[in-house]
């Protein structure tokens, strides 16, 4: 009888250990495809499984229950992983408890929207490239859908490289005679007229205010390149006209600068407008300025991520998960943000050390959050109009693209009380 009981006990222990096995998608330098790994985590959430995000553990790894379908998906997508026994899982959690690490539970796949004209191609926007490569589903919305109230269906919104001031990207001096520029103007003017606005700038302001309401109600906003500074400029200039006559048919108001209301903006204050239509720059927020870029060169241009306390500041820690701390810089219409113009309550996540350039920032507004990342494409140092698309299959371990994908998973995290 004792022999039978012993065999039963051994079987029970073995069964228990089998059940406790998990899959670790490690995110350090040994990972073969960091970007696809985010897609697998999202895929698990889509299928009703929870995912543990191990902040600062091996580059911000993912831990999830073992199952054959998951392993098959990992192999298909070329993502490296390892199986952990119950004892190994305990060791991982002991390490996390002891070090500057933490575990965040991801519970639900966030519904993702991208603000972009319907005819934009994925390669026009680094976030669309990241979503496509990681195989994460998204919906494209533009002005009509936003003003119709459709943002409320989504947890997370990315702003395309949009100019919310109505100045068409300040491309007038160089591209006003090109077909694509004329098409851009016509498309926006047609939409403004359709929706009952006398100017494109007034339409874009209405969109910006709707997005602000969305964030205040609990939405997650992520913006890159010119959608960062022009968004705040539109909010600040709500009661004035900063557009030159070539953009909207009448001159900018002479006192537009004095009438800016910085209390309405998310991230920036005390900036100075550059309203000359022949100058390829919006304001002095952008550093280095687009009209007089001071290039350090792709080999010398880096920015550094700050290290935060994972247990006391999990949000900033989530947004800065990466397998390296120094990340290659990259240019854009808005490359970076002048530190002296960033509001004091905004958290700086990454900056170019020894300079005034903030590259990556985050803040709260109402019940929601906003995160801004300067530059156009983390793997295309100096992007030009009509450049070929970046092939992410050649950049599967891109630290810069990981920052984008951190933001996509961020809304899935369960909120928990901070330790005191």
What are these regions (language model features)?
Residues 181, 196-197, 236-239, 244-247, ...:
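Catalytic cores of eukaryotic secretory-pathway lumenal/extracellular enzymes that build
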Residues 21-26, 32-63, 241, 339-420:
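Extracellular ligand-binding/catalytic regions of CAZymes and related secreted enzymes
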Residues 19-125, 134:
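Hydrophobic targeting/anchoring helices
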Residues 95-100, 144-146, 355-359:
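Alpha-helical scaffolding within the catalytic cores
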Residues 22-23, 28-32, 63, 67-72, ...:
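Helical hinge/lid and interdomain linker segments adjacent to catalytic or ligand-binding clefts
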Residues 105-108, 149-152, 214, 341, ...:
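Extracellular/periplasmic catalytic domains that process cell-envelope and extracellular macromolecules
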Residues 3-14:
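Sec-dependent N-terminal signal peptides
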Residues 122-125, 132, 229, 240, ...:
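Catalytic beta-strand/loop cores that center a nucleophilic Ser/Cys/Thr
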């Amino acid at each position: 009888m004792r022999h039978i009981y012993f065999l039963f006990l051994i079987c029970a222990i073995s069964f228990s250990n089998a059940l406790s096995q998990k899959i670790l998608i490690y995110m350090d330098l040994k990972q073969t495809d960091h970007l696809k790994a985010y897609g697998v985590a999202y895929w698990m959430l889509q299928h009703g499984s929870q995912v543990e995000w191990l902040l600062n553990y091996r580059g911000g790894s993912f831990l999830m229950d073992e199952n054959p379908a998951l392993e098959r998906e990992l192999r298909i997508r070329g993502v490296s992983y390892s199986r952990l026994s119950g004892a190994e899982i305990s060791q991982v959690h002991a390490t996390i408890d002891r070090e500057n690490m933490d575990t965040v539970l991801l519970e639900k796949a966030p519904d993702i929207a991208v603000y972009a004209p319907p005819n934009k191609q994925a390669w026009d926007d680094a976030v669309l490239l990241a979503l496509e490569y990681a195989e994460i589903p998204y919906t494209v919305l533009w002005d009509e859908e936003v003003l119709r109230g459709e943002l409320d269906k989504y947890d997370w919104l990315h702003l395309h490289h949009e100019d919310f001031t109505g100045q068409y990207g300040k491309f007038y001096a160089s591209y006003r005679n090109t077909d694509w520029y004329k098409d851009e103007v016509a498309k926006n003017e047609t939409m403004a007229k359709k929706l009952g606005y006398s100017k494109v700038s007034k339409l874009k302001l209405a969109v910006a205010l709707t997005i602000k309401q969305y964030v205040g109600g609990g939405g997650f906003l992520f913006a890159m390149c010119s959608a960062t500074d022009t968004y705040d400029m539109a909010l600040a200039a709500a009661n004035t006209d900063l557009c030159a006559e070539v953009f909207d048919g009448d001159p900018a108001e002479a006192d537009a600068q004095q009438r800016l209301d910085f209390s309405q903006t998310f991230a920036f204050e005390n900036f100075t407008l550059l309203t000359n239509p022949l100058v390829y720059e919006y304001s002095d927020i952008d550093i280095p300025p687009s009209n007089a870029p001071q290039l350090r060169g792709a080999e010398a241009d880096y920015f550094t991520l700050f290290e935060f306390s994972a247990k006391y500041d999990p949000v900033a820690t989530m947004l800065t998960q990466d397998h390296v701390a120094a990340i290659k810089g990259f240019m854009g219409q808005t490359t970076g943000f002048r530190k002296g113009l960033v509001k004091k309550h905004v958290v700086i996540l990454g900056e170019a050390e020894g300079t005034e350039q903030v590259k990556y920032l985050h803040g709260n507004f109402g019940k929601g959050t906003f995160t801004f990342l300067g530059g156009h494409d983390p793997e295309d140092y100096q992007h030009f109009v009509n450049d070929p698309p970046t092939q992410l299959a050649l950049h599967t371990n891109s630290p810069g693209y990981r920052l984008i994908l951190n933001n996509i998973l961020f809304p899935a995290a369960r909120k928990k009380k901070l330790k005191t």
